[in-house]
Amino acid sequence: MFKLIRRFISLIFLAIIAIPGYFYAQVWWGAHYPVTRSSDYAVVMGAAQYDGRPSDALEARLEKAFQLYQNGLVKKIITVGAGAPGDRFTEASAGREWLITKGVPRKAAISIPIGRNTIDSTIGYVDYLKKLKVNEVVIVTDPYHCKRATYIATDKGVNATCAPVQRGPYSLDRKSTRLNSSHT
């Protein structure tokens, strides 16, 4: 009987370590080895903006999307994200204006001011894409956010790949395992 109890406790202990370890490894792998393909649309996930000026995190995402646009990997860029109560601008509008000032045509920079989190923002842009009968997208976000963002998009019916940022406060060069843990 004691042997059976010890085996059961060992299995529970193994599960406690293995399950979070599996998810941690999935997030880490997606951050370090992204699969990015061309698409008609890129979606820049929202991040803070300060009175219309993108935060460092949002600017890094916008730069990556602009790079994809310049290289011909995407034809249009969607920015998403609502504003906080009292904000004069939304994350989406601040991002769109940044892209336009860099040379992206107004028709190619689309603002969807929906969502203060990944799920709500994803629902907003997926609804927009479905109206256009588009089902593929490249998501531009932080490396450790890629797995979550692509998983939610796929769950909502869109084929998604991720183009993680290479610089910025949440990029891989910061080597932040703390951040990795918070995005699992």
Where are these predicted regions, by residue range?
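N-terminal type II signal-anchor transmembrane helix
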Residues: F2-P34
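A structural signal for short, hydrophobic/glycine-enriched beta-strand patches
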Residues: Y24-R174
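Conserved small/polar residues in nucleotide/adenosyl-binding loops
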Residues: T177-S181
